[in-house]
A protein has these predicted regions:
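Membrane-embedded alpha-helical bundles that constitute the cytochrome b-like, heme-associated redox core
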Residues: 1-188
Length: 188
């Protein structure tokens, strides 16, 4: 499998970014739910610290992934030729929405922590600077925005997964296979 993208399939690096981010987003969901269920104390703060570290990791991987995608422009697999105009529009809207959320979610979480005067560290190794000053009202705004963005991420992710499954099982094309490390093209 090629490191770089081709017209037929995503390269191994694009796949690694995609699936690593998927795993980290699932981890975020678990960590956020764990933190919600815990009373204020050391366990909750430790869980939130891990949540922030994973969020920063997603932000970094999203930046690398976007850079890789841009550097491969012209080599990325095209959408299936038989897509209708509205399907193309929805595919682009979904992908752009996912990229936007991969940046907006971690950044609003970072701003929320900054406004609450809580540090954002990378697994305790080093501390990131505050993005905004301590401000209770701003903290509440960023918290609401962060939660709204999570809902948007959930909806767009479900649409993305359902579209991939639709292409695989109904359209019987290679849309899903070209993002799977073990996916082979269907016989013509």
């Amino acid at each position: 499998m090629s490191l770089r993208n081709t017209q037929e399939r995503w390269g191994s690096l694009a796949m690694a970014f995609h699936w690593a981010i998927v795993i980290l987003i699932l981890t975020q969901f678990v960590l956020a739910n764990m933190a919600e269920s815990l009373p204020l104390g050391m366990a909750k703060l430790a869980t939130l610290a891990r949540h922030k570290s994973v969020g920063i990791t997603i932000l970094g991987l999203a930046a690398l992934r976007l850079g890789w995608r841009i550097s491969n422009r012209g080599h990325n697999p095209p959408l299936p030729a038989d897509l209708k105009g509205y399907e193309r529009f929805l595919a682009h809207l979904t992908h752009e929405g996912l990229y936007l959320l991969l940046f907006a979610m971690p950044l609003t979480g970072w701003m929320m922590s900054s406004a609450a005067n809580y540090p954002v560290t990378f697994f305790g190794w080093f501390r990131f600077p505050a993005l905004v000053g301590a401000n209770k009202e701003l903290h509440e705004v960023y918290e609401e925005v962060h939660e709204f963005l999570f809902s948007a991420l959930l909806v767009i992710t479900v649409v993305h997964v359902l579209a991939a499954l639709y292409h695989h099982f109904i359209q019987k094309d290679d849309t899903l296979r070209r993002m799977l490390p073990f996916g082979r093209r269907r016989a013509a």
